[in-house]
Amino acid sequence: MPVRRLDPVLIDRIAAGEVIERPASALKELIENALDAGARRIDVAIEAGGRKLIRVVDDGCGMAPEDLDLAVERHATSKLPEGDLSSIETLGFRGEALPSIGSVAALEIFSRAMGSAVGARVKVDCGVKEGPAPAAQPQGTRVEIRDLFAGTPARLKFLRTDRAEARASAEIVERLAMAHPQVRFGFASSDVRGFDLAACADSPEGRLTRFSAVLGKDFRDNALFVEAEREGVRLQGFAGLPTWHRASAAAQHVFVNGRPVRDRLLLGAARAAYMDFLPSGRHAALVLFLTCDPREVDVNVHPAKAEVRFRDPGLTRGLIVGALKQTLADAQHRASPVNGASALDVLARRGPGFSGAGGPANWDWRRSPANPGFDAAALAGFAEAPAAAFAAVESLAADTRANAAAPSLEDLEAPLGAARAQIHETYIVSQTRDGIVIVDQHAAHERLVYERLKAARAGSKAPRQALLIPAIVELARAEVEAILDAAVLLAEFGLIIEPFGPGAVAVTETPALLQDPDPTRLARDLAAALVEDDGAAALERRFNLVLATMACHNSVRAGRRMRPEEMNALLRDMERTPGSGQCNHGRPTYVELKLADVEKLFGRR
């Protein structure tokens, strides 16, 4: 078969297959054009998921008739005046989006340039061009795409439902809106709920307002401000508290010079920073902006411009990891307030005044049963208080008599308050100036030990304590191999493991930071964890795995009674320790309930 030149319309349709994958792809190109035109308001409307109609209206600088004529020609653009691909400062630059769309749909553009008396119109219907011609149009541009993929009907079979496609388009608008808070965005659809995002100041507070409008108000309550700079690369944004984690990475948004990207390097750096804090399979919420010289990043490496390449990827990754870790460390013991709100919701629903049908609560004492049913086992952690002892409860079954003395003023002023009781020998209840705090003693102490072990390893040499008689631990062959492979790593933490014949190892020294550890159990748990991790994990992940296992072994266990001074010491240590708001598995170590919220449970507010 001879080689022949392809028809120009066919060329455009092939190009459209790369650039325009779905309605959301076309919408993204149109919004980027509007932003490059300096628009301050962008209104989007779609019908049937974008298949029937995509309309984008902006108040940007607009185009003169001669520019409008060229705009629908292949590889015609106003965004590369110097022809330099190494210094791209606009969102669009290839000049192929509009002709690609016009080759597979009915594309109509109305535009009026600033200072022009009249606007112009051009239409391209599946590759057939009409115009430009004069048309009534306010300053700015209106682009309408009708019957998308009419020129390539086979592509329609690969689209999802109208609702799913509309949701994808809404997400595109939201993502670009987060990058440009100074622009007002409107979105209307026949398939999903629309929205209107008011313009905000292009400042940290203004951006947080825009992010909260997109990601929900809980993001504001759980967001930590991030800011760092290194060798001309600047990072700014907000990162969610580790205890406010999500089931997917959908709430992770990264922008490079104002361009939204889904780059593995950047998302991997965020994952590495949170590795110490999140449960397996959970993801942090964050919005990060990287700003650098356009010459330091290549944005022309992906058909949809969704990925970028940095000239120095190590610098960028190090900046993100370092900045996020420092931000999380500065948060100290802070945990998500959503945990307290969730606890209040559970209490409210289980309380005697809750109406399961959603109606008003019944507060009529005459209708209250004479002997209300309750589970006596639920009160097993409490003993009957002596008469007239409400001022100082002396006999919670698991109480360590923390209430025997009034809390000191200094402890009450502390963020986590003064310990008043221990419940079920597992939870510490403390009183603050404006509420109460409930602490999981094992989870909290586990995190404290974990951070101490990390600090000890960062020093010159972790202190050890030699065992008078080495502990001989019998293990499976795979476990012996795994723990001996990690022997050098374990020695950095002060744990010395030596081979002891087939199927066994000897523990000769343990970390001095671990008080009275069980060396046999510690070795077995470490071996099992290392085998489960396949031994092929990154070195940092293996460090964290070893640290977490050791910390768990030396933590205050649930079921251990604690004296008041021990409980208060634990609270003060939590306040001083970075990351103590969550345990090594990502669970919260405490829940805070404000007095005003507790009073609502009892109808006082």
UniProtKB/Swiss-Prot annotation:
Lineage per the UniProt record: Bacteria, Pseudomonadati, Pseudomonadota, Alphaproteobacteria, Hyphomicrobiales
Coiled coil stretches, renumbered: none
GO cellular component: mismatch repair complex
Protein encoded by which gene: mutL
Gene Ontology BP annotations: mismatch repair
GO molecular function terms attached to this record: ATP binding; ATP hydrolysis activity; ATP-dependent DNA damage sensor activity; mismatched DNA binding
Protein family (similarity comment): Belongs to the DNA mismatch repair MutL/HexB family.
Described function: This protein is involved in the repair of mismatches in DNA. It is required for dam-dependent methyl-directed DNA mismatch repair. May act as a 'molecular matchmaker', a protein that promotes the formation of a stable complex between two or more DNA-binding proteins in an ATP-dependent manner without itself being part of a final effector complex.
Record protein name field: DNA mismatch repair protein MutL
Cited InterPro entries: DNA_mismatch_repair_CS, DNA_mismatch_repair_MutL, DNA_mismatch_S5_2-like, HATPase_C_sf, MutL/Mlh/PMS, MutL/Mlh/Pms-like, MutL_C, MutL_C_dimsub
SMART domains for the chain: DNA_mis_repair, MutL_C
